[in-house]
Amino acid sequence: MSNIVWHQHSVDQAARAKLKGQNPVLLWFTGLSGAGKSTLAGALERALFEAGFHTYLLDGDNVRHGLCKDLGFSVADRDENLRRVGEVAKLMVDAGLVVLSAFISPTREERDSIRARFPEGQFIEVHVSTPLSICEQRDPKGLYVKARRGEISNFTGISSPYEAPLSAELTIDTSKGDLASQVRALIDYLTAIGVINPDKAKALA
């Protein structure tokens, strides 16, 4: 690695963000399977996109079709999965995008490691705190049933722990309220911290 030198480009993040008229950021949605991470992140992305924002949604299932298709679900492979996603998200934020990532990401150490890659204010942790009982009732992929039968090992929430964030920027329980109000809460927060400027916020009203 000693012979590898970082090449500084003439176009930087600030210039890319200025061209797009937005402040780049990573919103990291974490929570149990079935908590509503992908649904919430997808609804927020749709709202931002329709208001003219340049966005990209990284989804836990989708990256395993390509970027991480060589990985399994051992502890080491899950760590590597998130490491890769964190690096991709960093590149996308550097490109000036508003990036949304929806991953169980069960440990604080994993999430804090990804946060550490970003400048202050460019990593926003969104804890989708829907209770296990509700997630298990939803079970959209039938995974909880399989985990209870012992057909899936190391399943987060059943046979493997989930460490809830201690100080997430936002906490949303999708079993309370409707999707529109939950997206509104996210938009209001992004406006309050300056990710969304007031003029563009009007388009999201």
From Swiss-Prot:
Function text: Catalyzes the synthesis of activated sulfate.
Protein name per the record: Adenylyl-sulfate kinase
Family of the protein in this entry: Belongs to the APS kinase family.
UniProt xrefs under Pfam families: APS_kinase
EC number, as in UniProt: 2.7.1.25
Enzymatic reactions: adenosine 5'-phosphosulfate + ATP = 3'-phosphoadenylyl sulfate + ADP + H(+)
GO biological process, one term: hydrogen sulfide biosynthetic process
Active site: 105 (phosphoserine intermediate)
Gene name of the record: cysC
Entry keywords, A to Z: ATP-binding, Kinase, Nucleotide-binding, Phosphoprotein, Transferase
EC class name: transferase
SUPFAM superfamilies: P-loop containing nucleoside triphosphate hydrolases (SSF52540)
Domain of life: Bacteria
